Amino acid sequence: EYKKYWIAVVAVLIIGFSILGYLGTDVYHQAPPVPTAYVSQDGQVLFTKDDILHGQSAWQSTGGQSVGTVLGHGAYQAPDWTADWLHKEVSVMLDIKSQEAFGVLYNQLGTAQQAAVKEVVKEEYLGSAVREDGTVVLSPERIAAMNATGRYFVELYGDNPDLTLTRDHFAMKDNTLPELQDRIDMARFFFWTTWMASTQRPGTDATYTNNWPHEPLLDHNPTPESVAWSVVSVIILLCGIGVVVWLWSFGKKDDEHALVPPTEDPISKITLTPSQRALGKYLFTILALFLFQLGMGGIIAHYTVEGQAFYGIPLAQYF
């Protein structure tokens, strides 16, 4: 009787996991590279792949995507560090280029001059490709912008009193990452995520992240493919729901039998087994866990209002 349903379930699982496996493999092969090193134009090594990977581990040790995120994964608290770094660094880069060319900051330029400076910066960011030896060369201006942005993040994850209010807004405690070297390498990891989000993927007209994040300073806009697949996926979802509803409503051969109410309460006939009776002793344990879960949920939600406290209780000093 249920054979055809089992066949349908197995077919859906096979097709679904086959697509998932193919796309997962494709994503793995197209993952952005981690350069062996970032170097200056005179060949000086700024930092290496090992520094980036150590910075990733250092960032993950603070909770990873729970407090701030990278590459747009999203978190309850704090901004996306990739998008935040990109905006800050490009802003500094535009000022540096503007001062070199015109002697004033970017926001003091006219429209035509701003467009010219922006185009120069865009070309440098998009063209920051990996060389055959696995390294990426950064210009002196890019290095200066990177270092200026990196100092902010090193101090943000430290205990700089000037950023105390910012940490409170982001639900970060002072000295989120106590070791200075860990903070420096973490900043390098953030830079790498920003590099992949602003560098053109070879053979395409978009960055490694399909022009994410939206950054007007670099004219980052969604690619036509991203828009098309977003629309197609919504259409497929709606059509699929419609087919399921139609089959359920009109595909059944027979109407369901009318339900007949029982003559007596069926629960009254149930006899508890010894194992069911033994569950009573765990009632208070379950209640305690439920209350603990409610409390933790309240604390986490309240971090949006008080980033380092809970109704005046300074939790950041203890946890």
Regions found by a protein language model. Give the residues of each.
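Soluble extramembrane regions of membrane proteins in the secretory/endomembrane system
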Residues: 29-227
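Alpha-helical transmembrane segments and their helix-start/interface "positive-inside/aromatic belt" motifs
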Residues: 2-15, 226-234, 271-291
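Alpha-helical transmembrane segments
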Residues: 20, 228-253, 318
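Gly/Pro-rich turn-and-neighbor structural signature
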Residues: 250-316
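Structural signature of transmembrane alpha-helix termini at the membrane-water interface
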Residues: 18-29, 245, 295-303
